[in-house]
Swiss-Prot record:
It comes from the Eukaryota. Residues 27-123 form the Glutaredoxin domain. The keyword Electron transport applies. GO terms for cellular component: mitochondrial matrix. Keywords: Electron transport, Redox-active center, Transport. PANTHER family: GLUTAREDOXIN 2 (PTHR45694), GLUTAREDOXIN-1-RELATED (PTHR45694:SF18). Belongs to the glutaredoxin family. The keyword Transport applies. This is Glutaredoxin-like protein. The lineage of its organism: Eukaryota, Amoebozoa, Evosea, Eumycetozoa, Dictyostelia. The gene is grxB.
């Protein structure tokens, strides 16, 4: 059974083009970072969940690339473009080896379970 919501799986060509071209410079920067770095955190200033995941990854010795797009009152349209592109509604957005694993809680869960990050930690 698919976990995608049915309404989100059907888009017209115009909608798909809009999503793909809305702040394409930002999307290209995120995609390039995901391609060139094993772990990427996409976030925003002053967000406690973003701060927490950055702190926890650092404490665990996981090297990561951090991309910050504004704060609560700036760059909202750029953050919206990332949300539309990934389909994930909140920040941070954490990518490991090119795969979106989720946000802060998901990342901490993966760290605690040791499923994704063991080989990424500094010895």
């Amino acid at each position: 059974m698919s976990t995608n919501r049915r309404i989100l799986t059907k888009k017209t060509e115009n909608i798909s083009n809009f999503i793909n071209n809305y702040h394409s410079d930002v999307i290209n920067e995120v995609e390039e970072s995901i391609t060139n770095n094993r772990v990427v955190v996409v976030g925003m200033a002053y967000n406690p969940h973003v701060s927490k995941v950055n702190k926890v990854l650092g404490e665990q010795g996981v090297q990561f690339k951090y991309l910050e797009y504004g704060s609560y009152f700036s760059m909202w349209s750029q953050r919206l473009s990332i949300k539309m592109f990934t389909g994930f509604p909140t920040y941070p957005q954490v990518f490991v080896d090119g795969t979106l694993i989720g946000g802060c809680d998901d990342t901490i869960k993966e760290l605690n379970e040791g499923t994704l990050f063991n080989d990424l930690k500094k010895k």
